[in-house]
Regions:
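Flexible, glycine/threonine- and acidic-rich loop/arm segments that mediate assembly and lattice contacts
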Residues: 1-383, 387, 404-409, 425-502
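C-terminal regions of proteins
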Residues: 391-418, 424-430
């Protein structure tokens, strides 16, 4: 009689290796998730360099030209300049409260209406500065620092009044709430009369802008007791780093190492500085075991703090709508460093949105060349597999190279939290003098600094303790494998980076 109990089953029923029959065994694990490691992003776009301090500090240039975005027309000849949210900084005399305006007498200005309503919106007027800035106010906490600049328009009209066929551009209600009085100004030159002198003219001192970051210590440990190191399994171990054999602890130790190497990169991408009133800062103050825990600024945090964020790319539809979104990004790049070559690291949804955008522009996606334009040379025919993906493209004066970022797609990392879709990284470098090499080197904007000296290299330390596996450091009947790294990420010129979010 045929019964279920007549069949050998090791996964169901009561059969096990106590039976005399051997099942058909696959000794190797199936790699159902492929290569599970996600590191490699920073190796692709950055570099690693040693450091010998608890902090890395760098300075970045400010803008060259004088411009103020938040100003208002007070009357026909007066513009009130908000000095604090400026693009350039005038002669710094000390504290914020004594910050001076960088506009000088006889400067020529463009006054542009950037309010929300009124006849002056989107229009500009040229004026001459007739007196040095006066009436400095504010500058304390929460109170903007302002001054008044007296000007004379080059047109027959004043800032607020009309003359002849011309009309006054701005209503001049100033702080009384007139929406049409909001303006931005920038200096485009100066005009002086014959025989003039500049004895009373102040010079502009560039403001010093610095940023800093501190390394964090990342640690992990693997432990196996002495008895289990001799435990032979029936599954052959094979991991991403080449470890193989029938000892299961080899797999455990290898995966601990691989996971730690991924953490070394993930911590640089996701790192967050502890806010003054945060729980982490409170623990560090009140618990001796956590003294010094202050976090580190990772890539995402640096871009959110000093860079740009684009929400819901192609959210209104693909094709031309997505192209309009991308043109908005180009306008922002023009506004910043205008670095020609940029890299796009995308999750699946952003990569497909960009592919769809480019395919829509290409005539092959629009029912033939009569409805669109084909760019480049394509050797497709009916017997070939079509390639709908794009690795790179040029728009305006910028080149973009697109690649998938596994970290954003993996279900156990950012694929689980889908609020970040991608990042734009400029292919920019800065020239610095390397004291260790004694030469000038070009350093990428994005790079890792790790603690190292002649006594200790903490880029990636690994050591074994216990009394098993060749280590005889204690009476512990176990092998402990320790991992440690001390590092931080330096994100320079973050104003050229962009984060794509949902």
């Amino acid at each position: 009689m045929t019964l279920t109990t007549n069949y050998l089953s090791f996964t169901e029923g009561e059969n096990d290796f106590a039976q005399q029959y051997l099942p058909e065994l696959y000794e190797q694990e199936v790699e159902r998730y492929g290569n599970r490691t996600i590191a490699g992003f920073l190796r692709m776009v950055g570099a690693e360099m040693p450091m010998t301090s608890d902090q890395v500090v760098w300075s970045e240039q400010n803008r060259l030209h004088v411009a103020y975005e938040t100003c208002e027309v007070i009357d026909d000849t007066t513009i009130r300049v908000n000095i604090d949210p400026d693009f350039t900084v005038g002669p710094p005399v000390g504290a914020v409260g004594s910050k001076e305006c960088a506009i000088k007498v006889n400067n020529t200005l463009v006054v542009y209406g950037n309010g929300t309503t009124g006849a002056g919106i989107g229009k500009s007027m040229k004026v001459l500065v007739t007196a040095a800035p006066t009436n400095y106010q504010g500058g304390s906490a929460g109170v903007p620092r302002t001054c008044d600049v007296t000007v004379a328009p080059y047109t027959a009209s004043g800032l607020t009044t009309s003359a002849g066929p011309e009309a006054g551009e701005f209503d001049g209600s100033g702080s009384s709430g007139g929406l049409n009085s909001a303006v931005a100004v920038f200096v485009y030159g100066s005009e002086w009369v014959k025989g003039s002198n500049t004895d009373a003219l102040a010079s502009i001192e560039p403001d010093f802008t610095q940023y800093s970051n501190s390394p964090i210590i990342i640690r992990d440990k693997f432990e196996i007791n002495g008895s289990d190191t001799a435990q032979i399994g029936w599954v052959e171990v094979a991991t991403e780093d080449g470890t193989s054999g029938y000892l299961w602890y080899l797999k455990s130790e290898s995966e601990t190492r691989l996971r730690f190497e991924d953490y070394m990169e993930m911590a640089m991408v996701e790192g967050e500085l502890a806010a003054t009133n945060s729980a982490v800062a409170g623990i560090a103050l009140n618990n001796a075991n956590y003294t010094g825990n202050k976090g580190t600024q990772g890539l995402f945090a640096a871009i959110q703090d000093r860079g740009h964020e684009f929400q819901n790319f192609a959210g209104t539809g693909g094709g031309n709508a997505a192209l309009e979104d991308f043109d908005t990004i180009l306008a922002q790049l023009d506004f910043e460093g205008a670095i020609e070559e940029n890299m796009l690291f995308c999750n699946r949804s952003l990569a497909l949105a960009i592919d769809n955008m480019l395919a829509n522009v290409n005539g092959s996606a629009q029912a033939g060349p009569s409805n669109g334009a084909s760019y480049g040379l394509f050797e497709n025919d009916a017997s070939m597999a079509l390639n709908f993906g794009f690795d790179g493209f040029r728009r305006g004066s910028y080149d973009f190279y697109k690649t998938d970022w596994k970290y954003l797609n993996d279900a156990s990392t950012r694929g689980l939290a889908k609020d970040i879709e991608g990042v734009l990284v400029p292919a920019g470098t800065s020239t610095v003098y390397d004291q260790m090499l004694g030469t000038n080197i070009r350093r990428p904007f994005l790079h890792v600094r790790y603690r190292a000296s002649e006594a200790d290299d903490r880029r990636l330390k690994s050591w074994v303790t216990g009394s098993v596996g060749g280590a005889y450091t204690s009476s512990l009947d176990a092998m402990e494998v320790h991992f440690l790294s001390e590092r931080c990420l330096v994100t320079q010129a973050a104003n050229n980076f962009m984060l794509f979010t949902t």
